[in-house]
Amino acid sequence: LLDIETGTQEVVGDFPGMTFAPRFSPDGKKIIMSFAKDGKSDIYTMDLENRIVERITNHPSIDTSPSYSPNGKFIAFNSDRSGYQQIYIMKSDGTNVKRISFGNGIYGTPVWSPRGDLIAFTKLHKGNFYIGVMRTDGSGERLLTENYYQEAPSWSPNGRVLIFYRETKTNAKGEGFSAKLWSIDLTGYNERLVETQTDASDPSWSSLLST
C-alpha cells in the first residue's frame, strides 16, 4: 500500500508466490488480487484491518484481473477455464460463477462501471487489441477502439469516459515502442492522447476527479 499524501509504503501479506492486479473493494476495507503459484492463478481477498486472506476461486485454471461491482456483491474476472481467456462474473464469495463473454477472440482486464450496468474489457482478435464494453450479462458488446496493442481500461467517475494505455511503434521498422495513455468516450468518439512526461501504462482514475 502507498499513502499518496505521505509517500509511506507498506507491504501487506507474505505470499509464497506472485501477487498481481490488486484492486480495492468499494468500501475500501479489502483488497482483491490474483495469486499465482505452481503454474496456476486464483483470486484472493485480504481484509485490510485484520490481514485475513480468503481464497475466492479454486480452479485448475488461470483466474486473473478481478474487479468488484460497485455494490460489492459481485466480482468480474477473466479465466481460461473454457480453454482460453474469457470474462466471468461470480458472487463476492466465489459462488455462482457464470461466463458472460462469447464473442470471437480472447478477453481480459474486465472492469465494472461506476453505475454497475457495464463492464469494460480488452479483447484480442485477429492480431489486434480492442477496448470495449458489454452489459453485465454479456449482451450488447461494443468495441470502441482498435490498435496494435492496448489494454487496461479504467472508468472515469461519471462513467462516460474510459482511459487506457496503448503501445505504438516508434519507427517504420518496428524496432521500438512507446506506451502512452489515451481516453475515449463511451460513445466511441473523442479519442484523445493524455499527455505525460514519460511513457505511461496501467492507468487508474481517481474517484476525486471527473470529466
Where are these regions (language model features)?
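Sequence signature of WD/YWTD-type beta-propeller architectures
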Residues: 1-211
